Amino acid sequence: MIFYIISLKIKLIRDYYKYNACIYNNNMEQIIQNVNTIINLYEQFGGSDYIGESQTQLEHMTRAAMLAEEFGEQNDIILAAFLHDIGHLIEINNDTIKMGSLGIMNHELIARDYLIEKGFDKDIANIIGNHVKAKRYLVTKYPEYKINLSEASRQTLLYQKNTMSQEEMTEFESDPLFNKSLKLRFYDDQSKLLSKSIKPLDYYRNLMIEYLSESTNNV
């Protein structure tokens, strides 16, 4: 009887680990598939013009991510920087929502929803979703900030509700992701001034897989 109970316990333990290994493998397959889909967007459309800036979409987002890493940011901010304008790539052929020649209207919200669908946590998605809001906030609070924006960024502001009301500013300041959203805006703006060589896409492919697998394990 004792032997039977011990054997049963061993079997249950084995079945438990087998089950969890199966779930882990399925999760990893889905993560890799999602990340490869994202990387394919960069490979296919990343070489397109970055709305009047002197760099491509891929160069802009990668330089923003590299700058965040140089400043010692955690992976959530680094990846937010790398992914922040992916909305322009997702809807690149959708002429109905273009801001003239200045990219895709509400690209930040398109990116936010897409990344949640691809398994990213809501924090990183909402940091990205806030980066246009952060520009509007800074233009309103610090009028001199607008002077330092690139010409293309000043033009897109006209499509993005321009300045904020006091109520909007107060609401944004109370957002738990407020500071991280401003950080992303800084890297977004500053990367437009850079011309350095960029890291390969595989670097960010691996970083995304690592980030998503850790997020899944912590659920």
UniProtKB/Swiss-Prot annotation:
Pfam families hit by this protein: HD (PF01966)
**Ranges for domain HD:** 57-158
State the UniProt keywords alphabetically: Hydrolase
Alphabetical list of InterPro entries matching this protein: HD/PDEase_dom (IPR003607), HD_domain (IPR006674), OP_Dioxygenase (IPR052567)
Q: Which GO terms describe its molecular function?
A: hydrolase activity
Spans through the membrane: none
Asked if Protease is a keyword of the record, the answer is no
Superkingdom classification of source: Viruses
Protein name, entry field: Uncharacterized protein L432
The organism encoding this protein is Acanthamoeba polyphaga mimivirus (APMV)
- Taxonomy of the source species: Viruses, Varidnaviria, Bamfordvirae, Nucleocytoviricota, Megaviricetes
